[in-house]
């Protein structure tokens, strides 16, 4: 079984949007052991959509067409697929009534926007795929030796339709005889190449497929097994994960979807009944925003400080003027004074500070990417850590500083 993903949209061709749909769908297919070696991008022109379908038909059995199902003039995908396959479009009357009800609930008259009826059409002979978060129907159609799947383009509609409406069909038709098991692992603070070299040296079972994905704030590693009995697969995966976690103890932060350095730090603070605060200079509040993106962060975080200027560090945190004058703001001494200052001012257990040079220019003779982290934990000596992140963008330096700061606190507390 081989699949092809055709993504429709002039915005994709022009580079105006990132095609996250194809990536998500390819990952779902991989978990079903469905190979998808081809991905095609095409604009909204019906002739080119049909040409892409003809090419896909020659090399794939399962063909996905994503995007172009809306109510506007350039949403032509369903009609183009129907024309190519010689299938008429049929109106799902019940679904059209649902669309009208939703439009009226938004104070939009269906008579004012009659083009919305396009979203209730599907291919004759196919199975409509409901849209849990939008209006346009998808379709699942078997046509001889080929299966065609038409899906919406907006990611907030695409993913729920794949998860709730499409996957049951794929599992029923193509999942038989295939068993795929995998685990998603998360790492912070380790370069991808070095991490993968170390994992390769662990002597893991040769049936395990280990792949890595670089994200802005972490490295994700997926460990996968194909066509193995469930009990054996579970045992092999757990053994491998335990070995990896021991090897990379300082950098491994957890497994599964939704895991992040921030979520793990919040969970650890909750477990220990501790509260944290922050004092940020170059990161400008990014640490506190990242922490507060985790549900339940209010249990471990009351507030903090953004002290960009030296005067703010002195006035709000109590950093001695002499410390700044003698050592500068980009220094071990200032980072430690900021950490202890915020921890004491807020009366909490942990204070984490960030001071440094985001770039692009040098500061106080320090090159861009020089960052000091300070960590003050009640009852312990204040500590600090130097980061060197040369040749990176301002945003990368800020993001990486936050991740490394959270990792510093996490490892110190666990």
UniProtKB/Swiss-Prot annotation:
Any Pfam family the entry gives: CinA
Superkingdom of the source species: Bacteria
Alphabetized InterPro entries for the sequence: CinA, CinA-like_C, CinA_C, CinA_KH, Competence-induced_CinA, MoaB/Mog-like_dom_sf, MoaB/Mog_dom
Disulphide bridges, residue numbers: none
CDD domains xref list: cinA
Family the UniProt entry places it in: Belongs to the CinA family.
HAMAP family, per the entry: CinA_B
Protein name listed in UniProt: Putative competence-damage inducible protein
């Amino acid at each position: 079984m081989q699949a092809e993903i055709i993504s429709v949209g002039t915005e994709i061709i022009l580079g105006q949007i990132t095609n996250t749909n194809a990536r998500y769908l390819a990952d779902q297919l991989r978990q079903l052991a469905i190979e998808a070696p081809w991905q095609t991008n095409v604009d909204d022109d019906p002739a080119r959509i049909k040409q892409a379908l003809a090419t896909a038909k020659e090399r794939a059995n399962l063909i996905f067409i994503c995007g172009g199902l809306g109510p506007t003039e350039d949403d032509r995908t369903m009609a183009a697929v129907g024309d190519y396959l010689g299938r008429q479009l049929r109106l799902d009357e019940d679904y059209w009534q649902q669309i009208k009800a939703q439009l009226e609930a938004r104070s939009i008259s269906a008579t004012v926007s009659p083009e919305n009826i396009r979203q209730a059409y599907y291919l004759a002979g196919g199975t409509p795929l409901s849209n849990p978060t939008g209006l346009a129907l998808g379709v699942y159609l078997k046509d001889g030796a080929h299966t065609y799947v038409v899906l919406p383009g907006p990611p907030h509609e695409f993913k729920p339709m794949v998860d709730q409406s499409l996957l049951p069909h794929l599992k029923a038709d193509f999942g038989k005889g295939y068993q795929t098991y995998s685990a998603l692992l998360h790492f912070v603070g380790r370069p991808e190449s070095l991490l993968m070299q170390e994992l390769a040296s662990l002597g893991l079972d040769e049936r395990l497929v280990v792949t890595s994905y670089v994200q802005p704030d972490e490295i994700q590693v997926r460990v996968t097994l194909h066509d193995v009995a469930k009990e054996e697969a579970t045992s092999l995966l757990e053994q491998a994960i335990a070995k990896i976690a021991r090897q990379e103890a300082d950098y491994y932060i957890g497994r599964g979807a939704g895991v992040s350095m921030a979520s793990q730090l919040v969970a650890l603070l909750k477990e220990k009944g501790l509260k944290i605060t922050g004092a940020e200079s170059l990161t400008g509040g990014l640490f506190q925003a990242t922490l507060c993106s985790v549900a339940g962060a209010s249990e471990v975080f009351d507030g903090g400080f953004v002290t960009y200027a030296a005067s703010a560090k002195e006035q709000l945190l109590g950093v001695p003027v002499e410390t700044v004058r003698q050592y500068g703001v980009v220094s071990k001494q200032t980072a430690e004074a900021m950490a202890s200052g915020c921890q004491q001012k807020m009366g909490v257990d942990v204070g984490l500070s960030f001071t440094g040079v985001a770039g692009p220019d040098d500061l106080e003779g320090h090159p861009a990417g020089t960052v000091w982290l300070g960590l003050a934990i009640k009852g312990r000596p204040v500590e600090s850590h130097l980061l060197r992140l040369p040749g990176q963008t301002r945003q990368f330096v800020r993001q990486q500083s936050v991740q490394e700061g959270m990792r510093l606190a996490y490892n110190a507390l666990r």
